Amino acid sequence: MVSFTVSVPATTANIGPGFDCLGAALGLYNHVTVTDPTDPEVDLLIEARGRDGEKISTTKDNLLYQAIAYFYQQTGQAIPPLKLEIDLEIPLARGLGSSATAIVGGLLAANQAAGNPCTTSEILQMAIAMEGHPDNVAPALLGGCQLAVKNGDHWQLVALDWPSKFVPVLAIPNFELSTEAARAVLPHQYDRSAAIFNASHLALLVQAFSQGRGDWLALALQDQIHQPYRQSLIPAYDQLHQAALAAGAYNLVISGAGPTLLAIADEVRAPQIASTLVETWHDAGIEAESHCLPIDTKGATITKLR
């Protein structure tokens, strides 16, 4: 088998009104290098290093390996012996799509090792089936900002413009929040008014991106489906929101399931907003870091090593 490395970007999902259907890839990556084990008696060897590497399973319940196993099950092939070297830059359980990087990375690694029998579209459908929703796996695989629309049993992906003048500012606290916990606080039913509110704001968000309208963006990022319920899980959310707006952000939203927060700002104000969010969280007794990250436009990539 030819050795290779799969690199998969972090993602920020929902982006205000786009709950479970909108996400964007960011310039922060997890990597997995796939080689043959040197010991012929070993069928699987997993090594993990980098950020939160000590929390990564090195047995067959590892999510990346589970994605590999799922691929081979779907294609009716036997899993070959594998050595997986996982190198992490993306923190776990922070709302930055770490699970999507494992799923997409595993599926692409398996496809490459098997001789690429599946198309990108087929890999995408497998990834959505594993993740349960498309908003992280779609941009992780394809790059850019992706809107997912259900079409029967499949999902149709539409790439949206994200003007470079709209800078993503990510504020990442030092505590985790699981997707399960963030989903548990959501209601099972919604008022019609909330559905109408989000439909109109998502439509405006598409136009704000398309036309580069910051004034529309500020309004469009509002949401009534998930953020009002998840804010209680994020300490000092109201203060952080107010501080971001005061520092010049168009608006501030929860990245994915949280607890990372996403502010969108122009290039001039973005660095100050990043500092302000860290300081505001520090004042609330929580340590955090912030990054002004570019939108990744390539998605997951494969680099052959030999």
UniProtKB/Swiss-Prot annotation:
Pfam family, one: GHMP_kinases_C
Gene3D superfamilies: 3.30.230.10, GHMP kinase, C-terminal domain
Keyword field: Amino-acid biosynthesis, ATP-binding, Cytoplasm, Kinase, Nucleotide-binding, Threonine biosynthesis, Transferase
Keyword S-adenosyl-L-methionine among record annotations: no
Compartments it resides in: Cytoplasm
InterPro entries: GHMP_kinase_C_dom, GHMP_kinase_C_sf, GHMP_kinase_N_dom, GHMP_knse_ATP-bd_CS, Homoserine_kinase, Ribosomal_Su5_D2-typ_SF, Ribsml_uS5_D2-typ_fold_subgr
Enzyme class: transferase
GO terms of biological process kind: threonine biosynthetic process
One cellular component (GO) term of this entry: cytoplasm
Binding site for ATP: 91-101
Pathway in which the depicted protein is active: Amino-acid biosynthesis; L-threonine biosynthesis; L-threonine from L-aspartate: step 4/5
Keyword Hydrolase: no
Similarity remark: Belongs to the GHMP kinase family. Homoserine kinase subfamily.
Purpose: Catalyzes the ATP-dependent phosphorylation of L-homoserine to L-homoserine phosphate.
Protein known as: Homoserine kinase
Native organism: Synechocystis sp. (strain ATCC 27184 / PCC 6803 / Kazusa)
Lineage: Bacteria, Bacillati, Cyanobacteriota, Cyanophyceae, Synechococcales
